[in-house]
């Protein structure tokens, strides 16, 4: 039996049919660089439209898992959490638009799925048939952002300001509710593997899609909450840094990784990490995403180096981080002499749950999937697949080349053009 209930399940089935709308880093920055109550209202309407669609698709993915997986306690809890969040957004009411907005900004105040949803609900509740919808005028919010209300002389009504703050509060509640979602999925997948001793390709595809969607949802939530509720910061648009210093991010990730290495192996000094990078190199990026990927790779390189050469070794070869700036990409190459990976195991490094390390428990389960984590993940097998998803989210990539018996090179590609939309499925 569905944990959602019949009515909510029908809403999921309806909303999941609508296409998702992917945004690029450039769009997010352009729209949020000079926020006004009007632009934030437009962003809120977009999220009120988009988030239920994304949540509905993930609910369906969870429901399409094998009977054993979809009946597990944590996965059922995730379905319920997503369903609750979706319904809370659906039930959020719009406001009357200010008349001072220019003609191009008179977008719909109701989501594009609202009329279809109402038609579905009327079948079960005829009393809704006379409900007035405010979606008959103008056009809906678009992601072309070229028409903004910056500079419009308008006394924004209190109802609009209240919508912005209330919606930010709701999204923050949803973000907190979903904090444990990814780790709950991971733990049930882990339990499933223990019981069946297998992770087939369909589960791999599901996890890639689920975690990529989670990155996107949390990105949209965090960006809107930051724009509405947090004081502006220099060189930031919401959570996006317009001048992310690549050297400083790598340096911070390196220090954290070395600290973890010293703790894990009881070393006085961890292997050296040499950074060859222009200290002034900057780009527009989400710093936590890059930090997550670099930290994960460096942590793996440090572990491989220490274990290959022995904890009691008098000398560890340095790990080298080389950064190159191209016309389209900034590429970060991380090279170690940690013994490499066998050719047979290369395809498996992208598989969730595959690891060459013994399990290391953490105090906080969030650390398994957190973009801000500096806690050991060795033994869970999520590190490399998640790091690759973070780099791919805005059009980059992560590649690995290994020489068994010597070491491994990992390439992190960052898209400088910032025009790639989210890879939604």
UniProtKB/Swiss-Prot annotation:
> Which Enzyme Commission numbers does its entry carry?
2.7.11.2
* Residues annotated to bind ATP: 296-303, 336, 355-356, 379-384
UniProt subcellular location: Mitochondrion matrix
- Which example biological process does GO assign this protein? regulation of glucose metabolic process
Give Gene Ontology CC terms: mitochondrial matrix; mitochondrion
- What keywords sit in the KW lines? ATP-binding, Kinase, Mitochondrion, Nucleotide-binding, Phosphoprotein, Transferase, Transit peptide
Q: Where is the Histidine kinase domain?
A: 180-418
Q: Which InterPro entries does this entry report, sorted A to Z?
A: AK/P_DHK_N_sf (IPR036784), BCDHK/PDK_N (IPR018955), BCKD/PDK (IPR039028), HATPase_C_sf (IPR036890), His_kinase_dom (IPR005467), Sig_transdc_His_kin-like_C (IPR004358)
* Any one GO MF annotation of this record: ATP binding
- Carrying Phosphohistidine, the residues are 178
Query: One Pfam family of this protein, by short name?
Result: BCDHK_Adom3
Q: Which reaction does it catalyse?
A: L-seryl-[pyruvate dehydrogenase E1 alpha subunit] + ATP = O-phospho-L-seryl-[pyruvate dehydrogenase E1 alpha subunit] + ADP + H(+)
Supply the enzyme class, top level. transferase
State the similarity comment. Answer: Belongs to the PDK/BCKDK protein kinase family.
Described by its record, this protein's role is as follows: Inhibits the mitochondrial pyruvate dehydrogenase complex by phosphorylation of the E1 alpha subunit, thus contributing to the regulation of glucose metabolism.
The name this protein goes by in its record: [Pyruvate dehydrogenase (acetyl-transferring)] kinase, mitochondrial
Organism expressing this protein natively: Schizosaccharomyces pombe (strain 972 / ATCC 24843)
Q: What is the lineage of its organism?
A: Eukaryota, Fungi, Dikarya, Ascomycota, Taphrinomycotina
């Amino acid at each position: 039996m569905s944990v959602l209930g019949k009515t909510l399940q029908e809403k999921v089935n309806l909303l999941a049919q609508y296409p998702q709308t992917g945004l690029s880093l450039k769009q997010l920055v352009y729209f949020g660089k000079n926020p006004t109550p009007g632009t934030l209202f437009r962003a809120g309407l977009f999220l009120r439209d988009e988030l239920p669609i994304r949540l509905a698709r993930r609910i369906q993915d969870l429901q399409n898992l094998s009977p054993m997986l979809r009946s597990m306690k944590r996965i059922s809890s995730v379905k319920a959490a997503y369903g609750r969040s979706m319904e809370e957004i659906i039930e959020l009411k719009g406001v009357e638009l200010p008349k001072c907005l220019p003609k191009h900004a008179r977008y719909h105040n109701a989501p594009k799925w609202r009329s279809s949803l109402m038609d579905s609900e009327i079948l079960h509740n005829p009393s809704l048939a006379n409900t007035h919808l405010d979606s008959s005028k103008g056009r809906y919010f678009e992601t072309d952002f070229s028409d903004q209300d910056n500079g419009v002389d308008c006394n924004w009504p209190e109802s609009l300001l209240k919508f912005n703050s209330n919606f930010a509060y709701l999204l923050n509640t949803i973000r907190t509710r979903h904090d444990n979602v990814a780790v709950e999925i991971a733990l049930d997948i882990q339990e499933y593997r223990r019981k069946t001793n297998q992770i087939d390709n369909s589960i791999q595809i599901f996890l890639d899609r689920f975690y990529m969607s989670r990155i996107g949802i949390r990105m949209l939530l965090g960006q809107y909450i930051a724009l509405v509720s947090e004081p502006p910061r220099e060189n930031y648009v919401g959570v996006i840094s317009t001048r992310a210093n690549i050297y400083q991010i790598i340096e911070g990730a390196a220090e954290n990784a070395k600290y973890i290495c010293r703790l894990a192996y009881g070393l006085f000094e961890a292997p050296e990490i040499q950074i060859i990078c222009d200290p002034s190199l900057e780009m527009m990026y989400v710093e936590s995403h890059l930090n997550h990927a670099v930290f994960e790779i460096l942590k793996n390189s440090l572990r491989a180096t220490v274990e290959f050469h022995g904890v009691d070794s008098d000398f560890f070869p340095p790990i080298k981080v080389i950064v190159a700036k191209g016309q389209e990409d900034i590429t970060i190459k991380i090279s170690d002499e940690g013994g490499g990976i066998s050719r047979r195991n290369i395809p498996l490094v992208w598989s969730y749950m595959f690891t060459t390390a013994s399990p290391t428990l953490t105090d906080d389960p969030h650390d398994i999937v957190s973009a801000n984590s500096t806690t050991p993940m060795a033994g869970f097998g999520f590190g490399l697949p998640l790091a690759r998803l973070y780099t791919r989210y805005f059009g980059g990539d992560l590649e690995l080349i290994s020489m068994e018996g010597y070491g491994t090179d990992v390439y992190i590609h960052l898209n400088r053009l910032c025009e790639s939309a989210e890879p939604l499925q």
